[in-house]
Amino acid sequence: MAILNTLALLLLLVFLVCCLALAAFIGSLLYMVVLHHRLKEQGLRREEELLATPLPPDAELPHVVVQIPSFNEGPVLRRGIEAAARLDWPRDKLHIQVLDDSTDDTAVLARTVVAELREQGFDIVALQRTDRSGYKGGALHEAMQKTPYDYFAIFDVDYVPEPDFLRTCMRPFFANPDWAFV
């Protein structure tokens, strides 16, 4: 009988420890959920504040270089380049670099699209390397060395940004001039 009483007490003790552990787990989980929601709210408020930062007049906006790296991506090339040309930014401050390391006929298409947009008054160049060291990252780095401007937007060729992309993304830089990227 004493063994049964001891066993019953031991089981009761194990049960109570498990209940306490479960309560601690649930309490921790609730704390993390509440903390997550508070931080999310703070982040959303901060984002709203940053996006409400007014842009200066067009004449005072900085130059922005849009880089579009590509490698054998002919089917999406024209769409990506033309989307960059549709960005709502002063044309004299928008510089587009098509960084095409293609080994197929995409390079010809890139030069054709670039020539068409240059005729329309865009500052756009097609840069092609024979040495593909670093792949797309190498192309981006090499092209950055060829421009005096500080602001860059990098889009993969299959990405189609909304026309207001630059106006939206540049706002935080005016609220925080010491920021390096958004």
Report each predicted region and the residues it spans:
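N-terminal membrane-anchoring/stem segments of glycan-assembly enzymes
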Residues: 1-58
